[in-house]
Amino acid sequence: MAFCTKLGGHWKQGVNVPVSSMLGSLRYMSTKLYIGGLSPGTDEHSLKDAFSSFNGVTEARVMTNKVTGRSRGYGFVNFISEDSANSAISAMNGQELNGFNISVNVAKDWPSLPLSLDESIEEAEKKENKMMSRSVWKDPFVDAFLMKKKNAALNRKIWSRRSTILPEYVDSAVRIYNGKTHVRCKITEGKVGHKFGEFAFTRKVKKHAKAK
């Protein structure tokens, strides 16, 4: 009898641990918000200020490209309570921030992200060192090599005229289909937020008069 009781206790403990862990993760995720559509000029300080009117903001993070250091156009805001997070979603989703309309939703993948700046830097260094060990023999300038790979990937993709240019495309050369042909275009910071079609001009062919 004592053996059965002890065994039952272990079984109950084994079941409760995963369930409580899962519930904790769901609660953790519901207080973290994903902020999309950020302008290139929005940093972590201005992002936190934008949500400071909602009580309980503990952290604001803007995700950046580790090669260029530029914003990827999205970030995360952490709240103490679910009520504050829900209020922020209702009030801020679709609103304008630094000239860009932002989207605000519950962060689905937040638990997989680093929990602190130190962890984020450590993880980035590990990935960078691993990538350098594979790439340094191909090109001694690793940053230039990574940028070349990024540009090559973007060049292979043909962008629609209706697509919006995001901050992560800056310094990349892309191909845009203008309805007749594919136009190469260099993306600069001034083009962020515009449609690809604004820069996919159709070349007019001049017809020469036939000699009589």
UniProtKB/Swiss-Prot annotation:
Q: What is its main location?
A: mitochondrion
Compartment(s): Mitochondrion
Q: Offer a single GO CC term for the protein.
A: mitochondrial small ribosomal subunit
- Example GO biological process: translation
User: Which portion of the chain is the transit peptide?
Assistant: 1-29
One term of GO molecular function:
structural constituent of ribosome
Q: Which InterPro entries match?
A: Nucleotide-bd_a/b_plait_sf, RBD_domain_sf, Ribosomal_uS19, Ribosomal_uS19_bac-type, Ribosomal_uS19_CS, Ribosomal_uS19_SF, RRM2_NsCP33-like, RRM_dom
Gene3D superfamilies per UniProt:
3.30.70.330, 30s Ribosomal Protein S19, Chain A
Q: Matching PROSITE patterns, A to Z?
A: RIBOSOMAL_S19, RRM
SUPFAM superfamilies in alphabetical order: Ribosomal protein S19, RNA-binding domain, RBD
Indicate whether Methyltransferase appears among the record's keywords: no
Q: Which UniProt keywords apply?
A: Mitochondrion, Ribonucleoprotein, Ribosomal protein, RNA-binding, Transit peptide
Describe, as the record does, how this protein assembles with itself and its partners: Component of the mitochondrial ribosome small subunit.
Q: What is the documented function of this protein? A: The RNA-binding domain found in RPS19 may functionally replace the missing mitochondrial RPS13.
What PANTHER family does this protein's entry cite?
RIBOSOMAL PROTEIN S19P FAMILY MEMBER (PTHR11880), SMALL RIBOSOMAL SUBUNIT PROTEIN US19M (PTHR11880:SF67)
The family annotation for this protein states: Belongs to the universal ribosomal protein uS19 family.
Recorded protein name is Small ribosomal subunit protein uS19m
Organism the protein comes from? Arabidopsis thaliana (Mouse-ear cress)
